[in-house]
Amino acid sequence: MNVNIKYPLVLHDNWLLESITGQINKNVKYTNSLIKKDFISPSSISKTPILRILRFLKTTKSSDLTAILSDSTHTVIAIFPFDPAIINFEIRYKHRITYHTPNSLILIKQANLRFVNNVELTTEWGITIEDEIDVAVLEVLDLEIFQRDQIMLGVNIENNLQLIYYDKSYLNLCGKSRQRDSLGEKEIKEVISQSYDDVVSI
């Protein structure tokens, strides 16, 4: 594991950005939302896929749960499908997935990588990303609690976490050329820091 002085998160590595951008082909026009099936599986990536649950966002109409996850340097939008992720988690641990899990570390055992259109992202997920950015999200199918301790990040550390969608390497793949006229990264961080009435995170 790399020691990162600027982002001193214990038991945490930075793998999100490189792993996600490595799966997106700039020259391919995706006709399906799925970018990579089994993007995370026992043998799919070289680094252990540990992420921190920064916060839960909204519950969708199909009872899936959306969230913001992070490694030591970047954040990404994720969704936990009710079936199988939430059902299996709550059977395994005998409590709701939102109970004492924000700010804890999870091990992603299986996940797909897929695009979500901006309309769905806004109406169903409660997040607005600039229209000219194609948004790839983690569809987490199976997870385990890696470290249950809810360790709050300092404000300075969390502020240094960057949404992958605004990283230059991601924009080179998924950004569009037209002028930006929507929310920037600062405004996005304000949106995702809000509390949502339909999700209880203890």
Curated annotation (Swiss-Prot):
GO cellular component entries: chromosome, telomeric region; telomerase holoenzyme complex
Location(s) in or outside the cell: Nucleus; Chromosome, Telomere
Pfam family, one: TPP1
Chief localisation class: nucleus
Keywords for this protein: Chromosome, Nucleus, Telomere
A GO molecular-function descriptor: telomeric DNA binding
Keyword hit for Nucleus: yes
GO biological process annotation, one example: telomere maintenance via telomerase
Subunit text: Component of the telomerase complex.
Family: Belongs to the EST3 family.
Primary role: Component of the telomerase complex involved in telomere replication. Stimulates RNA/DNA heteroduplex unwinding which favors the telomere replication by the telomerase.
Protein name from the UniProt record: Telomere replication protein EST3
Species name: Debaryomyces hansenii (strain ATCC 36239 / CBS 767 / BCRC 21394 / JCM 1990 / NBRC 0083 / IGC 2968) (Yeast)
